[in-house]
Amino acid sequence: PGALDDVEAGTGQYTTFSLGSNSSDSAVGKDGKGNLNANSNPGKITAVTDSSASGSAWATGTKTYNNAVDVDVYGNPQLNLFELAKAAGKATGNVTTAEIQDATPAVLESHSSERGCYGPQGKTDGSSNDAAKRCLVNQLKENGGIGSISEQLLDTRADVTIGGGSKYFRQTVQGGEYAGKTVWEQAKEMGYQTVENDPAAMNALEYKEGQPVLALMSDGNM
């Protein structure tokens, strides 16, 4: 009993409920005011989640590891909100002031084992060797994978997509039908109404049946 006298009141509860006896898979967390919450989403590997893991939980209902986008801890893609909505015949739209490939908007339209897989060459200029900013080999189109977040965004085909991150659409597709073309060129050939960093062109857009809007208004975040 004496050993517990020096422990701050509440520490036992915090350890038990928030950390789950040192497990990072607890469904209960502690907010900034010290209150226990039953709706937190600690990541699988670490007790502190990031936006990709928490966003994936929100978009798919599946908890996963930090840096993952809509895949489970084994890397298996999980159905997300847009896929469910489109299957039900609903219109979909994704509008953000961030780069459209950023984890929070990306969880609506893509699946990736690495959140930095923004374009075919990753979140880089194509020359970086930083593994955290590149796509995993088995995800690349040239290796039979589902492609980068930008490429998957086109396949998901939301009715309206507006945000930043246009520079990643200038990367070159490496495999499949559109190999050798930029992601922007692929979008146009797939029937998208495209706007790149052009407010006037954005304002001139009109609804056209079967021609989704893809307007990326900044190279990075808006």
Place the predicted regions along the sequence by residue.
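N-terminal catalytic scaffold of extracellular/periplasmic and nuclease hydrolases
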Residues: 1-207, 211, 218-220
